[in-house]
């Protein structure tokens, strides 16, 4: 699965993208976020609060309940806030 990171997510993880293998039990965007949160302190800081993130699967905005597969490209980016 190809993961792409934008803005503060990219800064926190120190990389713009990566390709990973995920367990067969990871079937949703939310499941992927939970899996990633367990991959180390930087990942935990980014993925432990899904309310602070948005995602896209194959360049289409996705909800955390939406399905993912190992052939997908999943992008994570911070929520947009305004002032």
Predicted segments with their positions:
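Ubiquitin-like/PB1-type beta-grasp interaction modules and other compact soluble beta-rich domains
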Residues: 1-82
């Amino acid at each position: 699965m190809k993961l792409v990171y934008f803005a503060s997510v990219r800064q926190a993880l120190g990389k713009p993208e990566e390709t990973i293998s995920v367990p067969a039990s990871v079937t949703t965007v939310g499941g992927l976020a939970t899996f990633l949160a367990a991959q180390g302190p930087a990942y935990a800081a980014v993925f432990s609060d899904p309310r602070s993130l948005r995602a896209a699967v194959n360049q289409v905005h996705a909800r955390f309940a939406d399905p993912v597969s190992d052939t997908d490209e999943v992008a994570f980016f911070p929520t947009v806030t305004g002032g």
